[in-house]
Amino acid sequence: MDEVIADPIKKFIQLYNRDYTVPLDLKIDAGNEIYHHVPKDVEQKWFEYINEPGFFRDLEIIPDSQRVIKALQQKYEVYIVSAAMEFPNCLKDKHDWLADHFPFIDWQHIIFCGNKIVNTDIMIDDRIKNFVNYPGRPLLFTSPHNLLVTDYERVNTWEEVAGLLL
């Protein structure tokens, strides 16, 4: 969900720039996590922000995700799977965010879990750890932290997802 249909990186940058005098911008080195771009003494701030109630409630939508996912539902049984248990405060935020921005996804097609051990035909994700032992077709959704990964079929945008799957 995060970095695939919702944008937590942009929100982190906004919060960081609000709280610190040295601005952080959207230019993130390939293969690095966002928190590697802040001074060492405030590196943990990322984890504080994402553990705050409300952090996930107003994230921006990844462009074209709504339209393409709605179209995918005409051809596939679509599930939203999020490893939300890692950040327990996010459960209600993510549920409410999905209800607002993806109301066409039935609540029975939303899975909050610890590990994405789902058995599906296709998984679109930004984290390669979720593809370990995954039996289906993994599609790696581009995010700064995975730009150096070459082992998986990559999609950079939801338009590319549509081109491959519709």
Model-found features: residue ranges?
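Acidic, Mg2+-coordinating phosphoryl-transfer loop and its flanking beta/alpha structural elements
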Residues: 123-159
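Substrate-recognition "cap/lid" segment bordering the active-site pocket of phosphatases
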Residues: 81-133
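Membrane-proximal envelope and lipid/glycan-remodeling enzymes
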Residues: 78-90, 148, 153-166
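Class I S-adenosyl-L-methionine
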Residues: 17, 70-73, 95, 99, ...
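Short, acidic loop-to-helix structural element flanking the phosphoryl-transfer center
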Residues: 48-81, 87-92
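Active-site neighborhood of HAD-like aspartate-dependent phosphohydrolases
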Residues: 1-45
